[in-house]
Amino acid sequence: MAVKHIVLFRFKADASAETVKEGTSRMLSLKEGCIHPTTQKPYIKALTGGKDISIEGADNGITHAFVMEFESIEDRDHYVNNDPYHAEFKSWIISYLEKFIIVDYEEGVF
Protein backbone atom coordinates (compact mmCIF):
# COMPACT_ATOMS: atom_id res chain seq x y z
CA MET A 1 0.00 0.00 0.00
CA ALA A 2 1.28 3.48 -0.86
CA VAL A 3 2.85 5.54 1.92
CA LYS A 4 2.69 9.34 2.02
CA HIS A 5 5.61 11.09 3.73
CA ILE A 6 4.93 14.72 4.64
CA VAL A 7 7.86 16.98 5.53
CA LEU A 8 7.36 20.49 6.91
CA PHE A 9 10.21 23.00 7.35
CA ARG A 10 10.65 26.25 9.17
CA PHE A 11 13.88 27.77 7.95
CA LYS A 12 15.89 29.81 10.44
CA ALA A 13 15.23 33.56 10.27
CA ASP A 14 18.83 34.21 9.22
CA ALA A 15 18.78 31.66 6.37
CA SER A 16 19.49 33.56 3.17
CA ALA A 17 17.17 33.43 0.18
CA GLU A 18 19.91 31.52 -1.66
CA THR A 19 20.09 28.93 1.12
CA VAL A 20 16.31 28.48 1.11
CA LYS A 21 16.35 28.07 -2.68
CA GLU A 22 19.17 25.54 -2.49
CA GLY A 23 17.45 23.67 0.35
CA THR A 24 14.16 23.38 -1.49
CA SER A 25 15.89 22.41 -4.75
CA ARG A 26 17.91 19.75 -2.97
CA MET A 27 14.78 18.45 -1.27
CA LEU A 28 13.05 18.08 -4.64
CA SER A 29 16.16 16.39 -6.09
CA LEU A 30 15.61 13.46 -3.71
CA LYS A 31 13.05 12.04 -6.18
CA GLU A 32 15.75 11.29 -8.75
CA GLY A 33 18.76 11.08 -6.42
CA CYS A 34 17.51 8.36 -4.09
CA ILE A 35 18.30 5.04 -5.76
CA HIS A 36 16.84 1.71 -4.66
CA PRO A 37 19.62 -0.73 -3.69
CA THR A 38 18.06 -3.67 -5.55
CA THR A 39 16.63 -2.11 -8.70
CA GLN A 40 19.27 0.64 -8.96
CA LYS A 41 16.45 2.99 -10.02
CA PRO A 42 14.79 5.96 -8.32
CA TYR A 43 12.08 4.69 -5.97
CA ILE A 44 10.27 7.79 -4.72
CA LYS A 45 7.02 7.62 -6.72
CA ALA A 46 6.14 11.30 -6.36
CA LEU A 47 7.54 14.40 -4.66
CA THR A 48 5.98 17.85 -4.66
CA GLY A 49 6.46 20.88 -2.50
CA GLY A 50 6.22 24.61 -2.10
CA LYS A 51 6.17 27.63 0.17
CA ASP A 52 3.33 27.91 2.69
CA ILE A 53 0.53 30.14 1.40
CA SER A 54 -2.16 29.31 3.94
CA ILE A 55 -4.40 32.16 5.07
CA GLU A 56 -5.72 30.28 8.12
CA GLY A 57 -2.99 31.41 10.51
CA ALA A 58 -2.41 27.89 11.81
CA ASP A 59 1.00 27.21 10.24
CA ASN A 60 2.94 27.46 13.52
CA GLY A 61 5.73 29.16 11.61
CA ILE A 62 6.15 26.42 9.02
CA THR A 63 7.49 27.97 5.82
CA HIS A 64 7.65 25.06 3.35
CA ALA A 65 5.83 21.77 2.82
CA PHE A 66 6.69 18.66 0.82
CA VAL A 67 4.72 15.49 0.10
CA MET A 68 6.43 12.30 -1.02
CA GLU A 69 4.91 9.00 -2.02
CA PHE A 70 6.53 5.60 -1.63
CA GLU A 71 5.28 2.30 -3.04
CA SER A 72 5.59 0.55 0.32
CA ILE A 73 6.55 0.88 3.97
CA GLU A 74 9.75 -0.99 3.12
CA ASP A 75 10.72 1.69 0.59
CA ARG A 76 9.93 4.42 3.12
CA ASP A 77 11.98 2.60 5.75
CA HIS A 78 14.96 2.32 3.40
CA TYR A 79 14.69 6.03 2.61
CA VAL A 80 14.61 7.02 6.29
CA ASN A 81 17.20 4.58 7.61
CA ASN A 82 19.64 3.68 4.83
CA ASP A 83 19.53 5.90 1.76
CA PRO A 84 22.92 7.67 1.46
CA TYR A 85 21.60 10.49 -0.76
CA HIS A 86 18.89 11.26 1.79
CA ALA A 87 21.38 11.01 4.68
CA GLU A 88 23.68 13.55 3.03
CA PHE A 89 20.77 15.93 2.47
CA LYS A 90 19.64 15.64 6.10
CA SER A 91 23.18 16.37 7.32
CA TRP A 92 23.35 19.48 5.17
CA ILE A 93 19.89 20.98 5.75
CA ILE A 94 19.59 20.51 9.51
CA SER A 95 21.78 23.52 10.29
CA TYR A 96 19.44 25.81 8.33
CA LEU A 97 16.20 24.65 9.96
CA GLU A 98 14.64 26.06 13.09
CA LYS A 99 11.98 23.36 13.09
CA PHE A 100 10.83 20.40 11.06
CA ILE A 101 7.86 18.06 11.28
CA ILE A 102 7.51 14.71 9.55
CA VAL A 103 4.27 12.74 9.31
CA ASP A 104 3.71 9.50 7.40
CA TYR A 105 0.50 7.64 6.63
CA GLU A 106 -0.93 4.87 4.51
CA GLU A 107 -3.84 6.09 2.42
CA GLY A 108 -7.18 5.11 3.91
CA VAL A 109 -5.73 3.53 7.07
CA PHE A 110 -7.24 5.18 10.15
Predicted region positions:
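A common structural junction motif
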Residues: 28-35, 86-89, 97
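C-terminal structural segments of small proteins and small subunits
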Residues: 76-79, 89-92, 96-99
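Short, surface-exposed ligand- or partner-binding patches at beta-edge/loop junctions that are enriched
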Residues: 82
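Short S/T/G/P-rich N-terminal loop/turn motif that feeds into the first structured element of a domain
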Residues: 1-63, 67, 71-78, 104-110
